[in-house]
Amino acid sequence: MTMKRLALFAAILAAAGCSTPPDHFHTLRPAAAAANTVAREAPRLLAIGPVTVPDSLGRDEWVVRTGDTGAMVYDHQMWTQGLGADVAQAMVDYLNRGPLPGGLWADAGPTGSGSGADLERPAPLRLRVQVLRFDSILAPTPAVGDQVRWTIECLPSDASLGPVDAGRYRVVRTAVRDAAGTAPPANPAVEESQQRFDRVARAHSDTVRLVAEDVAAALRDSADERARSCIDGR
């Protein structure tokens, strides 16, 4: 009798283990993530980082908006890495697809953390990114509400600037990109239970793409002569 009870208990535990939902991982990086050869051979570096995100999003699990003021953590819907690092890597991928002006390529450092601290030496140009909002909405329709502030900074090489400014980054351009709206259509290749999450992840990724395009345009069109000299490497 005791053995039967033990066997039943073991069967219940096994069934409970089988019912645990699997973890699903998402990334902001575009599918064709490999940087083109021209970008990798470019002589000048745009360092991506630091990238900061709201404290509430500083976790691997998804935080989803519910109603006007609520939020819910989805334990089994996860980013492939910390959100700040994923934003940094996605920014690198989008920038190195071609929108950067000639002679520049983007890098988030060997670890891809977006901190900029792991680069071998200070880059002449740096992109600081502050994610102000990164709202994921699943119902009634998958959507996002994003707000990202970006700042291009230049490390002057002009010795005439004096000891106060020497070795300090100066702001070239700063702006805020707002992106909100319905997520793109469902991808039939994704299992049905995951389509809402996949749509939201792709919408967030599109926000990063728009920021990358804004940054590239600002680098191409800078009218500030000192900034222009820094960007062109003169």
Give the residues covered by each predicted segment.
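Sec-dependent signal peptide recognition
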Residues: 3-9
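C-terminal motif of bacterial Sec signal peptides marking the signal peptidase cleavage site
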Residues: 14-17
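Surface-exposed short loop/turn segments
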Residues: 19-36, 98-160
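N-terminal segment of the mature soluble domain
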Residues: 43-126, 214
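Soluble periplasmic/extracytoplasmic beta-strand elements of cell-envelope proteins
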Residues: 45-50, 63-65, 126-131, 145-151, ...
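Short secondary-structure boundary motifs at beta->alpha junctions and helix caps
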Residues: 70-77, 157-215
